[in-house]
């Protein structure tokens, strides 16, 4: 599944709601606020699922 920039996602195993900020070669860059600052990390697209605020499936 590919994600679009600005889409909301979460890690399949659970975790914070994150916003997609980039996508390249199957890796999805996400950012989120952890209560102290903005965090950034890249995940393989298979590790993520669409969040509540995501676009409907086509």
What are the language-model segments listed below?
Residues 4, 8-52, 57-58:
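Basic/aromatic-rich interaction segments and small domains that mediate binding to polyanionic partners
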């Amino acid at each position: 599944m590919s994600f679009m920039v600005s889409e909301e996602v979460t890690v399949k195993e659970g975790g914070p709601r994150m916003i997609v900020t980039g996508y390249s070669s199957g890796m999805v860059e996400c950012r989120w606020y952890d209560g102290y600052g903005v965090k950034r990390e890249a995940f393989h697209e298979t590790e993520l699922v669409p969040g509540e605020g995501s676009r409907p499936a086509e």
